[in-house]
Swiss-Prot record:
Keywords: GTP-binding, Heme, Iron, Magnesium, Metal-binding, Nucleotide-binding, Transferase. This is Diguanylate cyclase DosC. The gene is dosC. Heme binds at residue 98. Is composed of an N-terminal sensory globin-fold domain that binds heme and oxygen, and a C-terminal GGDEF diguanylate cyclase domain. The record marks 43 as: Involved in oxygen binding and important for the stability of the Fe(II)-O(2) complex.
Length: 381
């Protein structure tokens, strides 16, 4: 990514250096004179799109976005060589914000198209000569295109990182009590194994036993486990073990005489033992792999730490927009925390934080999310 930004800096610098200073001055003049009108017209057109409207409330547009758009137009069209590096950083920051709140890249691209469309008549209605108008337009469009490319590339990178964090949070939230889930599934497959062993040893018959894929463990693995652990190699190994043993199981069910033969019966029992043993080993490895996601948990309070706050807020904002419900965030600041630490020691301070976290969590309804914002702050969404 750094190499890309360096290349774009060179290209943007080259555009500014090669442009006639008079043309650059006229582009800056257009920007200063018309940025306010352009920002108003820009958001008027963009907000017609129903998809874009989801992200652009009237209050938000009036309070923040129009003035930000004005500054952006002036900065890009008035760029000097010394401004280029700062402008690239601005595009990167804007892209990160877009990715964090979930604005799709197609809306950003539509916005650039609208801006170039409304800029054209502004430039060509000026009193510049025809040649100057054309050069100002070319310089302005090329400047906007470079800014757009930098922003889009940074957006894609930020969106990819955000998606990974979304996936990490999904796994973390689904398997927050991973140890308990692991033991539950191990007990489930062992119970299935013991049930079959008893039937084979006592009756030489599988009776109404289900194949592994249809037993409780198999159903959990195929409908939940595969989804939770998608992308981890052990998932494929467990899937193949289940499939292979189901083949042996179904063959034995079709030919019950196999279990009347002692050597074949022993072979079948060894196969089930070997399969279950391998699956349990792989299952433990899966949960160990997932345990690394616990870096998303504050060690002291056992609450979500700041790592997942952008993911949580993005999800909550999307839900509030979709349902038209208000969204509030409560920040709880533990008062006199430094004084407590200095007077009674860090162990006492830690115990107070644990107590506050426990009581706060206990009093929250299940749909609310409590996270540790910093060493002394809790956030409730």
């Amino acid at each position: 990514m750094e190499m890309y930004f360096k290349r774009m800096k060179d290209e943007w610098t080259g555009l500014v250096e090669q442009a006639d200073p008079l043309i650059r001055a006229k582009a800056a003049e257009i920007a200063l004179a018309h940025a306010h009108y352009l920002s108003i017209e820009f958001y008027r057109i963009v907000r017609i799109d129903p998809h874009a409207e989801e992200f652009l409330s009237n209050e938000q547009v009036e309070r923040q976005l129009k003035s930000a758009m004005e500054r952006w137009i002036i900065n890009v069209l008035s760029a000097q060589v010394d401004d280029v590096e700062r402008l690239i950083q601005i595009q990167h920051t804007v892209a990160e914000v877009h990715a964090r709140i979930g604005i799709p890249v197609e809306i950003v691209e539509m916005g650039f198209r609208v801006l170039k469309k409304i800029l054209y008549p502004v430039i060509f209605s000026s009193d510049y000569s025809a040649a100057e108008k054309l050069q100002v337009y070319h310089f302005s469009i090329n400047s906007i295109d470079i800014a757009m490319e930098v922003m889009t590339r940074a957006f894609t990178f930020s969106d990819s990182s955000a998606s990974k964090e979304d996936e990490n949070y999904r796994i973390f939230s689904l398997l927050e009590n991973a140890e308990e889930e692991k033991e539950r599934q191990i007990a489930s497959i062992l119970s299935w194994e013991i049930d079959i062993i008893y039937k084979v040893l006592l009756d030489s018959d599988l009776g109404s036993s289900l194949p592994l894929s249809q037993a409780d463990f198999g159903l959990w693995f195929n409908h939940k486990g595969r989804h939770y652990f998608s992308g981890i190699a052990e998932v494929g190994h467990i899937s193949r073990l289940i499939q292979d043993f189901d083949g042996i199981f179904n063959q034995t069910m079709r030919n019950t005489r196999i279990l009347n033969n002692r050597s074949l019966r022993v072979k079948f029992l060894l196969q089930i033992r070997n399969t279950v043993s391998q699956i349990i080993t792989l299952l433990r490895e899966l949960f160990e792999e997932v345990s690394r996601h616990e870096v998303g948990m504050d060690v002291l309070t056992k609450l979500l730490n700041r790592r997942f706050l952008p993911t949580i807020f993005k999800r909550e904002i999307a839900h509030a927009n979709r349902t038209g419900t208000p969204l509030s965030v409560l920040i709880i600041d533990v008062d006199k925390f430094k004084e407590i630490n200095d007077t009674w020691g860090h162990n006492t301070g830690d115990e107070i934080l644990r107590k506050v976290s426990f009581l706060s969590q206990k009093r929250l309804v299940k749909s609310k999310i409590l996270g540790a914002g910093s060493s002394r702050k809790l956030a409730v969404s």
